[in-house]
Amino acid sequence: MIISNYVLTGETPSKKNSRIGLRSGKNIPSERYQKWKKAKHIELLHQGILCPPLEKPLTIEFYFYHTDNRTRDTDNQISSILDLLKDAKVIKDDNWQIVRRISAVALLTKSKEPSVNVVISEY
């Protein structure tokens, strides 16, 4: 049974491949990633976030809509979105006890802007 469905517009940046190394040796996400995360958090709020965060076993499906054939790292895009869902308190955590199944489909579309449809359902 579907619990919630979110649409995030634009391309999803990879958090892992866009880190900045500081002189102290610490790595932080790039400014581009941080801006994306803040904007997508607001998008989630406008679409309605369930309270409290989901903590039962879940299946999360990702439908990526791309407008070009550029190479992308889908695994890292999924990690960025899972971190966003956790930080926005949509899900309690992104560990295996909660997120039991993940599936991803990448589609080429000419009719709309890039986006990802995130479907959360019971496991």
Give residue spans per PLM region.
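Acidic, proline/glycine-enriched N-terminal capping motif
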Residues: 1-123
